[in-house]
Curated annotation (Swiss-Prot):
It is found in: Cell inner membrane. The gene is nuoN. NDH-1 is composed of 14 different subunits. Subunits NuoA, H, J, K, L, M, N constitute the membrane sector of the complex. Keywords: Cell inner membrane, Cell membrane, Membrane, NAD, Quinone, Translocase, Transmembrane, Transmembrane helix, Transport, Ubiquinone. It comes from Azoarcus sp. (strain BH72). The keyword NAD applies. This is NADH-quinone oxidoreductase subunit N. GO terms for molecular function: NADH dehydrogenase (ubiquinone) activity; NADH:ubiquinone reductase (non-electrogenic) activity; quinone binding. Pfam families: Proton_antipo_M.
Length: 491
């Protein structure tokens, strides 16, 4: 038996993050007096270093290593860069919030890095086993982060719900993967694609496996009918953790959906498209209608996120029409653009909640934003940009994300789906505009001046301005998405 030494070069960033997570654990153990600041600083250095390594090791052509378990392509590289950026911004936004509550412990940052490593493995997986390992590493880190505040009964309850439902979803996903292996005889995603294309797979077992696979993907995206955990976890976790849950994992879940469904099961698209269609429509309808009744902003954004993920799925399901992949590139590019847009908007929305929160006070109710324009006209404008963008009002990034997806849906011939999506967007605009009305036309319930670190103010301002700026010139990001997906094909 010959042992082939794998090529470590494409996976340098993953190895670097894993090593740095161990270094931070050891360093903070022996430097207790400066452990909190040291862990935070080293974590940001790690994310910046990983970004530099990923950029320098990027390959325009797809390469595989570790017995084809790891794939290095532009899709993985770009999503990893976005994950680093999202995690760095989330940690920066949350630092003062955590410090006020004595939660900025080294373990928090180690868990954040391990979660990042899990997402990196997910987006670069060409094998069902490595995909599952990355998913579990991300999930277990998230469970611990949700329960990180041991004095919060609400957080502990949310973590328990998240863990139980997450374990169930992981079991369903693993069962689906085992059935795919039974149907195709391989665990490699590229091998599964070849087996399905050559009609060498057992169709009955394959379709059963696809159903369980879809259940796992839908849970990680937080869409109907696997959405039950989203509102409770968003509400129960402290806002710094909610910010993390609502952003980077969505990019990893998008990558998982693309790798498994588009790359691996493209030739049975007519089956998973039908499932995705009903899931997406139900998510858009339920998400928007449920959000209207919410008075807690975190729960409102949770239901809003369910709706947004439904929109993203519309892009994925519109790629193939009657076996013709003519519009596939445009549709999948629209879905990727939507995922990126949602992450940018979520960073700003939860960042604003953190900005208005202080020790002993959580600004998570809609009434807490009353009269914000009188307290801070600048940040009221930033929050207005976020709400307008999420509502899909021209000319913000959210408008063009929805427009791109709707164009793909119409091109695929799903006119009734587009009509429902537009109608729900109009209805959903109510709860976004309600917050704008509260900020500009109600009297402030709290006249306390906004106190926040300079870096939070600067980055949050840049975040809000980016939502408007990309909305004015979205073509650059759309072109990037198209180029990345065009260059990222199975080797």
């Amino acid at each position: 038996m010959n042992f082939v030494v794998p090529d470590f070069y494409p996976a340098t960033a993953e190895i670097f993050v894993a090593v740095m997570a161990l270094v931070i654990m050891l360093a903070t153990t022996f430097a207790r007096s400066v452990a909190r600041g040291l862990a935070y600083g080293l974590t940001l250095v790690t994310l910046i270093g990983a970004a530099i390594i990923t950029y320098n090791t990027a390959n325009p052509r797809a390469v595989t290593t570790f017995s084809n378990m790891f794939i290095g392509d532009l899709l993985g590289d770009v999503l990893k860069l976005l994950i680093y950026f999202s995690m760095a911004v989330a940690l920066l936004y949350g630092r003062s919030y955590l410090a006020d509550r004595k939660l900025d412990k080294p373990e928090y940052y180690v868990l954040a890095l391990l979660m990042t490593l899990g997402m990196m493995v997910m987006v670069t997986s060409n094998h069902l086993l490595s995909m599952y390992i990355g998913l579990e590493l991300m999930s277990l880190s998230l469970y611990a982060l949700v329960a990180f505040d041991r004095d919060s009964a609400r957080g502990t309850e949310a973590a328990m719900k998240y863990f139980v439902l997450g374990a169930l979803a992981s079991g369903l996903l693993l069962y689906g993967m085992s059935m795919l292996y039974g149907a195709t005889g391989t665990l490699e995603i590229s091998g599964i694609a070849k087996s399905v294309y050559n009609q060498a797979a057992n169709d009955t077992v394959l379709l059963f496996g696809l159903v369980f696979l879809m259940a796992g993907i839908c849970f990680k995206l937080g869409v109907v009918p696997f959405h039950m955990w989203i509102p409770d976890v968003y509400h129960g976790a402290n806002t710094a953790v909610t910010l993390i849950i609502a952003t980077a994992p969505k990019l990893a879940a998008f990558a998982m959906a693309v790798r498994l469904l588009v790359w691996g099961l493209f030739d049975v698209a007519e089956h998973w498209q039908t499932m995705l269609m009903f899931v997406a429509v139900l998510s858009i309808v339920l998400g928007n209608l449920a959000a209207i009744a919410q008075t807690n902003l975190k729960r409102m954004l949770a239901y809003s996120g369910i709706s947004h993920m439904g929109f993203m799925l519309l892009g994925l399901l519109s790629g193939v029409v009657d076996g013709d992949p003519h519009y596939a590139l445009d549709a999948y590019s629209a879905a990727m653009f939507y995922a990126i847009s949602y992450v940018i908007m979520s960073l700003a929305s939860f960042g604003m909640i953190i900005l208005l929160s202080r020790a002993g006070f959580e600004a998570e109710n809609i009434d807490d934003f009353k009269g914000l324009n009188k307290r801070s006209p600048w940040f009221a404008a930033m929050m207005m940009f976020v709400m307008f963008s999420m509502a899909g009002i021209p000319f913000f990034i959210g408008f063009f994300a929805k427009l791109a997806v709707l164009q793909a849906v119409v091109a695929a011939g799903y006119i009734w789906v587009a009509v429902v999506a537009v109608l729900m967007s109009v209805i959903g605009a109510f709860y976004y505009l309600r917050l704008v009305k509260v900020m500009y036309f109600d009297e402030p319930a709290d006249a306390t001046p906004i106190q926040a670190p300079a870096e939070l103010r600067v980055f949050l301002s840049a975040n809000g301005l980016a939502i408007a700026a990309i909305g004015l010139a979205p073509q650059g990001v759309m072109t990037l998405c198209t180029f990345v997906l065009l260059a990222s094909t199975q080797p």
